[in-house]
UniProtKB/Swiss-Prot annotation:
Any one GO molecular function term: D-amino-acid dehydrogenase activity
PANTHER family from the UniProt entry: D-AMINO ACID DEHYDROGENASE (PTHR13847:SF280), SARCOSINE DEHYDROGENASE-RELATED (PTHR13847)
Entry annotated with the keyword Flavoprotein: yes
Job description of the protein: Oxidative deamination of D-amino acids.
Residues binding FAD, per UniProt: 3-17
HAMAP family (alphabetical): DadA (MF_01202)
Uppermost EC category: oxidoreductase
Species this chain originates from: Pseudomonas savastanoi pv. phaseolicola (strain 1448A / Race 6)
Full protein name: D-amino acid dehydrogenase
Length: 433
């Protein structure tokens, strides 16, 4: 059975790999010249199942108002003429309740924990190397209020059976010795010892090579224009003016997925949240992070690779704008300079931005659609690297009609209710150009 996977980021590539392992004949198509050239290229580098949390949380609407007035805020909103931006924001606000937060976080942690286990198995089976570390993640709280507010997250961790440790200042210095000199600005920390780190782009590139060995064909530099459909089936995909056919189709185009789905009458609430990262060469390994640090105040992750520090975070609701905002670089430099002033050379840092495909409830969209042979794997937000292996394995099981190892409840697009309009009344338009 032939499967056409659209997108070669970490989500598309893991989908292709697990589909090939399940015996499918797989082709991957992407407009870029290689795998992991967009959102997967320079993300924060953390595999953090326990910190899988939706942006839509109680208290966020009030915090957002304050953030808009701050210079170094974790969230910024740039008004556009795109009506989808405002519809998405309205949906997100509806998810900022305690009850919705609990449901959404459970779904995210469920998939993330499974994904971490799949990554462990993959590494054991293949020996894939990607500058990975298995030394946990430490979330830093600069205020007592932040530490107190962690109670709701800890409750979900306990419900999901995720190990954790609350740290005082001495505990922080024990797990991250380079922070010993700055613990005075911290109130405490939450550590998840089972979390991991690694270079997502390096992982994706090497997994693509392994997928090729399994028979997967990667076709780069090709423009995906639109899906051709009739009734409840996809007939093919228009690629560079030619109709390409398969038995099953997987849409893993991140923030661009809705553009291909809209002509089918499918409303997928996936919108880009623009993020930024700095990659800093390490000059003093003893003064650099041991693993991953999360700064709760600024919503920024600081991750240790072999000889580099990756500082990633921020969220701009700004449509598909990929311009580099110097103020965001200033913020990232300020944070890493605050915590690890002697760890790396900021003058040699590389600055990057990417679009995180985010759903209003934080949970990705993985699974079937109203079209019998079309499947989605998109909307992972800031957790594409964390959720990639589990999402790819889950999707392959669903397409193969095998019982997945975890519950897929609440993960497919049906959770949004009536997502399909009458497709025949929607004019097809080229996408992903």
């Amino acid at each position: 059975m032939r499967v056409l996977v659209l997108g070669s980021g970490v989500i598309g590539t893991t989908s292709a790999y697990y589909l090939a392992r399940a015996g499918f004949q797989v082709t991957v198509v992407d407009r870029q010249p290689a795998a992991a050239m967009e959102t997967s290229f320079a993300n924060a580098g953390q595999v953090s199942p326990g910190y899988a949390s939706p942006w839509a949380a109680p208290g966020v609407p009030l915090k957002a108002i304050k953030w808009l007035l701050q210079r170094h805020a974790p969230l910024a909103i740039k008004a556009t003429a795109d009506i989808d931006q405002y519809l998405w924001m309205a949906q997100m606000l509806r998810n900022c309740t305690a009850s919705r937060y609990t449901v959404n976080k459970e779904r995210m942690v469920r998939l993330s924990e499974y994904s971490r286990d799949c990554l462990d198995e993959l590494r054991l089976e293949t020996g894939i190397a990607y500058e990975g570390r298995s030394l946990g993640t430490t979330q830093l709280f600069r205020t007592q209020a932040q530490l107190d507010n962690a109670a709701k997250d800890i409750a979900v961790l306990e419900q999901s059976g995720v190990p954790y440790e609350l740290l005082d200042r001495d505990g922080i210095a024990r797990v991250e010795p380079a922070l010993a000199g700055v613990t005075g600005i911290l109130s405490g920390a939450l550590r998840l010892p089972n979390d991991q780190t690694g270079d997502c782009q390096l992982f994706t590139t090497r997994l693509a090579e392994m997928a090729v060995e399994l028979g997967v064909e990667f076709r780069y530099g090709q423009n995906i224009e639109r899906l051709d459909h009739a009734g409840d089936r996809i007939n093919g995909v228009w690629i560079d003016g030619k109709l390409e056919t398969a038995d099953r189709y997987v849409l893993a185009l991140g923030s661009y997925s809705p553009q291909l789905l809209k002509p089918l009458g499918i409303k997928a609430p996936v919108y880009p949240l623009k993020g930024y990262s700095l990659t800093v060469p390490i000059t003093n390994p003893a003064m650099a992070p041991t693993s991953t640090i999360l700064d709760e105040t600024y919503k920024v992750a600081i991750t240790r690779f072999d000889n580099r520090i990756r500082v990633g975070g921020m969220a701009e609701i700004a449509g598909f704008d990929l311009s580099l905002n110097p103020r965001r670089r200033e913020t990232l430099e300020m944070i890493v300079g605050d915590l690890y002033p002697q760890g790396g050379d900021l003058t040699q840092a590389s600055f990057w931005t990417g679009l995180r495909p985010t759903t209003p409830d934080g949970t990705p969209i993985v699974g079937a659609t109203p079209f019998r042979n079309l499947f989605l794997n998109t909307g992972h937000g800031t957790l594409g690297w964390t959720m990639a292996c589990g999402s790819g394995r889950l999707l392959a099981d669903l397409i193969a009609r095998k019982t997945p190892r975890i519950s897929a409840e609440g993960l497919d697009i049906s959770r949004y209710g009536n997502t399909q309009e009458n497709a025949q009344h929607v004019n097809p338009a080229p996408a992903h150009q």
